[in-house]
Curated annotation (Swiss-Prot):
Allows the formation of correctly charged Gln-tRNA(Gln) through the transamidation of misacylated Glu-tRNA(Gln) in organisms which lack glutaminyl-tRNA synthetase. The reaction takes place in the presence of glutamine and ATP through an activated gamma-phospho-Glu-tRNA(Gln). One of its GO terms (biological process) is translation. Gene3D superfamilies: Amidase signature (AS) domain (3.90.1300.10). It comes from Neisseria gonorrhoeae (strain ATCC 700825 / FA 1090). This is Glutamyl-tRNA(Gln) amidotransferase subunit A. The lineage of its organism: Bacteria, Pseudomonadati, Pseudomonadota, Betaproteobacteria, Neisseriales. The gene is gatA. One of its GO terms (cellular component) is glutamyl-tRNA(Gln) amidotransferase complex.
């Protein structure tokens, strides 16, 4: 029962071939069996889940259901929900129960979806491997010696392991797309401002964006229909007419122009990634898409620009965690200043501390112009590059990561880890939508994904192209043993 896609589960629930309680119980049983080894979930509340499932069954019986009523969903530990712990995988918020619900979570609750739990992540969404979690690293379900990616690694892992039909993630510099690639699932980062950030704990506010993660592009489109929309509680939310993100799913690829950035098809990609790209190019050609070369010359500068800007915003956003009103507080201190220092030293992990220090440094007197202001100018140049490219094409095909998932505990420096986001970060700098879909496997049997990037608010076009690729391939249908 846990092998269904989100769409299949919804159809079976609506036709009353299965009940929401039966489906939720099947997932809870699978989680109890597999999660201790996977560590994909860090919070489960069986009573709350089954209560939501019973309410969904009542709604279906009354004929008042949506296509998503009764379908289970997992939430990254960064999304608030009344009565649920959301710790952002940090000691700082360990056992903190939020008194309110994120808008995007409420949207799915209004549809009647059933909460399965909170998924593991890099602390405060800062990381690319899911090793920066206070609750221990999540494992890649294809090979537990490897990382699932990050920061939404737990969400990717539970969907790939069929411990949830879908999950929510957040993407600040690739945190939906990179773990989706490493775990062999589909995930989309929408245009910045498409999905409300209210109730999603902030890392870097001008980058953060929530998005769906599921087995297929069709599932992501269905979920995004429920997630997206204007929210007056979020000052960065776009006020636009409601869209149907499934509208292009049946549109053929014939005549669609696909841009291939010459900077992204480099010697730095592993053979596995090159093969995955060629697999996708062959599929696109076979369906009549036109391939054109484009250039994104500022890509090489996107990583330093991103880490200056995101760290500056993180340093500001995380200043609220001081032990005064909520969260961890040091047990022993002499005065208020010592309490602040000890609380933050004890509550934050090493990667979070590193980024806070970088952010404080680049915003300090004498360095603001040299780093922060220059990074903002680079951000504009990156966005301009994409607009130049989209004048020649409809969508851009690119790698998601330079290689398949690395091993847990791999001896890599922070800078080497940051470089693994080389192909995802530019999209966040520009605020564009992008989707990762499975496109092959490494020699070691690990999934490899590619990404499709579109212009602003082109989510339906991206999802349609991805769906057409998936209709003619089966990588998305593979699952770990």
């Amino acid at each position: 029962m846990t092998q269904y896609t989100l769409k299949q589960a919804g159809s079976l629930l609506q036709s009353k071939q299965i009940s929401a309680v039966e489906l939720a119980s099947a997932y809870l049983a699978a989680i109890a069996e597999k999660n201790p080894a996977l560590n994909g979930y860090i919070t489960i509340d069986q009573d709350k889940t089954l209560a939501e499932a019973r309410a969904a069954d009542e709604r279906i019986a009354q004929g008042n259901a949506s296509a998503l009523t009764g379908v289970p969903v997992a939430y990254k530990d960064i999304f608030c929900q009344t009565g649920w712990r959301s710790a952002c995988a940090s000691k700082m918020l360990d056992n903190f129960i939020f008194p309110y619900t994120a808008t995007v979570v409420q949207n799915l609750l209004d549809e009647g979806m059933v909460t399965l739990g909170r998924t593991n992540m890099d602390e405060f969404a800062m990381g690319s491997t899911n090793e920066n979690s206070f609750y221990g690293a999540a494992k890649n379900p294809w090979n537990p010696e490897h990382v699932p990616g990050g920061s939404s690694g737990g969400s990717a892992a539970v969907v790939a392991a069929r411990l949830a039909p879908a999950a929510l993630g957040s993407d600040t510099g690739g945190s939906i797309r990179q773990p989706a690639s490493h775990c062999g699932i589909t995930g989309i980062k929408p245009t910045y401002g498409t999905v409300s950030r209210f109730g999603m704990v902030a890392y870097a506010s001008s980058f953060d964006q929530a998005g769906p993660m599921a087995q297929t592009a069709e599932d992501c489109a269905i979920l995004l229909n429920a997630m997206a929309g204007f929210d007056p509680k979020d000052s960065t939310s776009f006020e636009r007419e409601k869209e149907d993100y499934t509208r292009d799913l049946d549109k053929p690829l014939k005549g669609v122009k696909i841009g291939l950035p010459k900077e992204y098809f480099s010697e730095g990609n592993s053979t596995d990634v090159q093969t995955a790209l060629q697999n996708t190019i062959d599929l696109l050609k076979a369906q009549g898409a036109e391939l054109v070369e484009v250039s994104l010359p500022q890509t090489k500068l996107s990583i330093p620009a991103y880490y200056v800007l995101a760290s500056a915003e993180a340093g500001t956003n995380l200043s609220r965690y001081d032990g005064v009103r909520y969260g961890h507080r040091a047990a022993q201190f002499g005065d208020l200043e010592e309490m602040y220092g000890k609380t933050r030293a004890e509550g934050f992990g090493s990667e979070v501390k590193r980024r806070i220090m970088i952010g404080t440094y680049v915003l300090s007197h004498g360095y603001y112009d040299a780093y922060y202001l220059k990074a903002q100018k680079l951000r504009r140049l990156v966005a301009d590059d994409f607009q130049t490219a989209f004048a020649r094409c409809d969508l851009i095909l690119a790698p998601t990561a330079p290689s398949a998932a690395p091993k847990i505990g791999a001896d890599t420096s922070p800078v080497e880890t940051y470089l693994s986001d080389i192909y995802t970060i530019a999209v966040n700098l520009a605020g564009l939508p992008a989707l990762t879909l499975p496109a092959g496997f490494s020699g070691g049997g690990l999934p490899v994904g590619v990404q499709l990037v579109g212009n602003y608010f082109a989510e339906a076009k991206i999802l349609g192209a991805a769906h057409q690729i998936q209709l003619n391939s089966d990588w998305h249908g593979k699952r770990p043993e």
